[in-house]
Swiss-Prot record:
It comes from the Bacteria. This is Uncharacterized lipoprotein YgeQ. May be missing up to 250 C-terminal residues compared to orthologs. It comes from Escherichia coli (strain K12). A lipid is attached at C17 (S-diacylglycerol cysteine). The keyword Lipoprotein applies. Its main location: membrane. It is a lipid-anchor. It is found in: Cell inner membrane. InterPro entries: 6-hairpin_glycosidase_sf, 6hp_glycosidase-like_sf. Gene3D superfamilies: 1.50.10.10. Residues 1-16 form the signal peptide. Keywords: Cell inner membrane, Cell membrane, Lipoprotein, Membrane, Palmitate, Signal.
Length: 264
């Protein structure tokens, strides 16, 4: 998936690119946006770019009736404050507690059909890391932040993830080409699965492009920062295969030549 910062996911739920098309059997960002835009309830608007001489106007399909008159090309300071106030509840992170972990879902939907079609109700590594960064910036949320990070660490330490790392370390060619994206370390899972299994489609792991080294790099970066600050201690390191998974992930990224490997 492209553009999965917490801000981008928020905006994706409000408006989407009107030129996106679904391609092939694999679910992509284009097909997700196409599903959202096909509802028929969107308001079609055109906006001036900041540099109209160089860049043309851009088009947005706005799905939120609440915000359709609030999205503008330019804002005053008071308008920005008003927008922050209007979206205050929307921007709050909702944590999902399970016996096997604490999760930040990419998004939630009122109807199961949209959730099933987009899979934004799954747990995404990158989105959860952005959520963790928001939580850890507030001392009052430090306990919840650590729970989220440890849950992601446990996901990266599952037997399936460790096997993917070991397989690529042994044979980096497993990542060559487009059809082998499922061989990469996975970056998304079903929070309802006690073993943090893949999102399922017709009883099988859904085909997805998991080649997202930027998410893996952010994960390692934040993990190291948590160690440096003492947030993560020796007891945390010693649980299960956490230490093993970190060592394997570093070797995996090296064997995958992450610096030249294209992200999805």
């Amino acid at each position: 998936m492209k553009g999965k910062s917490a801000l981008t996911l928020l905006l994706a739920g409000i408006f989407s690119c009107g030129t996106c098309q679904a391609t092939g059997a694999e679910v992509t960002s284009e097909s997700v946006f196409n599903i959202l835009n096909s509802t028929g309830a969107a308001t079609d608007k055109s906006y001036l770019s900041l540099n109209p001489d160089k860049y043309p106007n851009y088009r947005l399909l706005i799905h939120s009736a609440k915000l359709q008159n609030e999205i503008k090309s330019h804002y005053t300071k008071d308008e920005i404050q008003g927008l922050l106030t209007l979206t205050e509840n929307t921007r709050k992170l909702t944590l999902t507690e399970k016996p096997w972990g604490t999760f930040i879902l990419a998004s939630t939907f009122e109807d199961d059909k949209t959730a099933a079609e987009t899979h934004y109700d799954a747990v995404w590594l990158r989105d959860s890391l952005w959520g963790y960064m928001a939580l850890v910036s507030d001392q009052g949320n430090s306990v919840a932040a650590k729970k989220v990070l440890l849950t992601l660490w446990d996901y990266m330490s599952t037997p399936d993830q460790i096997k993917r790392m070991q397989d690529v370390i042994s044979n980096p060619k497993r990542l060559d080409g487009i059809p082998v994206q499922m061989n990469a370390v996975h970056i998304r899972f079903d929070s309802n699965s006690p073993v943090m299994a893949d999102v399922q489609e017709e009883g099988k792991p859904q085909l997805w492009n998991h080649k997202q080294n930027d998410a893996l790099g952010l994960y390692l970066d934040l993990l190291i920062q948590a160690i440096n600050t003492g947030t993560i201690n020796a007891e945390d390191w010693q649980k299960g295969d956490r230490l093993k998974s970190v060592a394997l992930l570093i070797a995996y990224l090296d064997k995958a030549n992450f610096y030249v490997m294209e992200d999805s």
